[in-house]
C-alpha cells in the first residue's frame, strides 16, 4: 500500500484502482512521505474519498491530531458498546464537533444543551457512551467537558447508528418532545422530576408516538370503554393531552388520534401524581 499524500501522523491518502482512499492507524504515516509503503496490518480504517469524505481529508490536515485520535477512540468504544458499526460520516462530524468543544472550553465558553434531559431519557446507551467520552477527554487532555457535551456526543452517535434518519430528523424529534414536555409543565404549573421513571416512560412514549405519526404508521388503539374511563377519572390530565394534540396539529401538521391521547393521559397522570 503506497502513500499518495501524508495527511497527519495517523492518516494518509492512497490511490487504488484510480480511486482515492483515506487510510488510518496509529502512527502509520509518522516520518513517512509520498510513495513510502504502509503495512496492511497497521491499517485500522479505510475510507473511499467521496464528497463527504473530502471534508474529512481536510479535517485530518487542519485539526489537532490528538482531537482526531480522541474522536476515533470514542467511535471505536461506541461501536464496541453498541455491537454495530457506525456510519462513515461520524468520523467527520464527531472530530469537528469535539475539537470545537475543546477549543470553546479552553477559551472559557460554555454552551448549554437545552435538550440534555430529553437526550438522557431517549438515548440512554448513547448518553452513557457520551459520559465515557468526556471522561476520556479529561483523562487524555486534562480538559473537563461539561455534561452537556455528553448529550451532544450521544446525538452524534445515535445519528450514526441510523440508516434512514438524519441528524436533522433526530434533533427535530427531540425538540418536538421537549416542546411537549414544556407544555405539560406549563399546564400543571409545576416542576417535574426529570430523573424519575415516570418521566422517562413519558418521554419514551412520546418518541414512539411522534415517530409513528410522522411515518404514518398505526398507533395502538385503546378500548373505547377504557378511553371513556380515563377521560372521566383523569379529566385534567386528559385535557392536557388534548392540548398536546392541538399543538402537534398546529405546529407540525400531525394528527394525534383520540385513543393515543388516552395513552398519553396515563403517562401524564403518573408524572402528575409523582409531583404532588
UniProtKB/Swiss-Prot annotation:
Keywords: Activator, Phosphoprotein, Repeat, RNA-binding, Transcription, Transcription regulation
Gene3D superfamilies: CAT RNA-binding domain, PRD domain
Every PRD domain range: 62-167, 168-276
Reported regulation of activity: Activity may be regulated by phosphorylation.
Cysteine-cysteine disulfides: none
Consequences of knocking out this gene: Deletion mutant exhibits a 10-fold decrease in the synthesis of sucrase SacA.
Any single biological process term in GO: positive regulation of DNA-templated transcription
Pfam families: CAT_RBD, PRD
GO molecular function, one term: RNA binding
InterPro entries: BglG_antiterminators, CAT_RNA-bd_dom, CAT_RNA-bd_dom_sf, PRD, PRD_sf, Transcrpt_antitermin_CS
Xref: PANTHER family: CRYPTIC BETA-GLUCOSIDE BGL OPERON ANTITERMINATOR (PTHR30185:SF15)
Cited function: Mediates positive regulation of the sacPA operon by functioning as an antiterminator factor of transcription.
Family from the record: Belongs to the transcriptional antiterminator BglG family.
Protein name: SacPA operon antiterminator
Native organism: Bacillus subtilis (strain 168)
Lineage summary: Bacteria, Bacillati, Bacillota, Bacilli, Bacillales
